[in-house]
Design a protein with these regions (language model features):
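Cell-wall polysaccharide-cleaving catalytic domain and substrate-binding groove, primarily
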Residues: 1-138
Length: 138
């Protein structure tokens, strides 16, 4: 049972899953006894960020979803989200244009992208050092 204080922490941060990845794959760093039932739970924020970065890289490499617009439209579909506002925020926060091509091996851009997306998903900033840890694990 969660305490009131724990419930006040955004779900993505409670689960160390700042991009709110739904349960599906088996990930390195998953919690041994998850309780969420809908979203992945990781042992640390770095592992949750690692999983998010792996998915985003896959979007770019395999599916050629290589712009903020294409990535966010896949990640946060219009039937569940305010996708256009999500895109606008990520672009403003990262300095990227919606249709600028993103290179998956560009650490700085990928870290900015995942940081901005995490803010949209959880409403809180993730420390840059944590994002870099996740990137180094990915």
């Amino acid at each position: 049972m969660q305490t009131r204080k724990q419930k006040m922490i955004p779900r993505g941060l409670r689960n160390n899953n700042p991009l709110n990845i739904r349960i599906g794959n088996t990930w390195l760093g998953e919690r041994e006894h998850p309780t969420d039932g809908e979203f992945e739970e990781f042992v640390s924020l770095a592992y949750g960020l690692r999983a998010a970065l792996i998915i985003l890289r896959r979007y770019i490499r395999r599916y050629h979803l290589n712009t903020v617009r294409l990535i966010v439209e896949r990640w946060a579909p219009r039937n569940e989200n305010e996708t256009e506002k999500y895109i606008q925020f990520v672009c403003k926060d990262t300095g990227l244009m919606p249709n600028t091509t993103i290179q998956y091996e560009d650490e700085k851009t990928m870290c900015k992208l995942v940081g901005a997306m995490a803010f949209v998903e959880c409403g809180q900033r993730i420390e840059k050092d944590e994002i870099i840890k996740g990137y180094s694990l990915a």
